């Protein structure tokens, strides 16, 4: 159950870290945004290692669905952009795929 917490926190730190670079490089904000970006992306990587999974690739694949959910939420809540129907449809497919991976029997080393 803690896996979901680690995934959620990792997603927040990854999105914020990437968004900080976006602000600097795409919106002309101060280069000082690199500092919180690097801290946030480091925390993202550390948190993702807390997931109880035998293989990194499987953990990252399952995390991808949660990241996409968090990204669409970020789009609406932080950037104040209403997600399109295609955003919701793509999100649904990704969540289904991530759920299949999460519920699979091979989360521990065989």
Curated annotation (Swiss-Prot):
Q: NCBIfam families given for it?
A: PRK02237.1 (NF002586)
Entry similarity comment: Belongs to the UPF0060 family.
Q: How does it sit in the membrane?
A: Multi-pass membrane protein
Q: PANTHER family under this entry?
A: UPF0060 MEMBRANE PROTEIN YNFA (PTHR36116:SF1)
Gene Ontology cellular component annotations, sorted alphabetically: plasma membrane
What is the protein's name according to its record? Answer: UPF0060 membrane protein PSPPH_1503
Record the organism: Pseudomonas savastanoi pv. phaseolicola (strain 1448A / Race 6) (Pseudomonas syringae pv. phaseolicola (strain 1448A / Race 6))
Locate the transmembrane regions by residue number.
Answer: 5-25, 28-48, 59-79, 84-104
- According to its UniProt record, what is one Pfam family this protein matches? UPF0060
Query: Which keywords belong to this entry?
Result: Cell inner membrane, Cell membrane, Membrane, Transmembrane, Transmembrane helix
- Which cysteines share a disulfide bond? none
Q: InterPro entries per the record?
A: UPF0060
Localization in the cell: Cell inner membrane
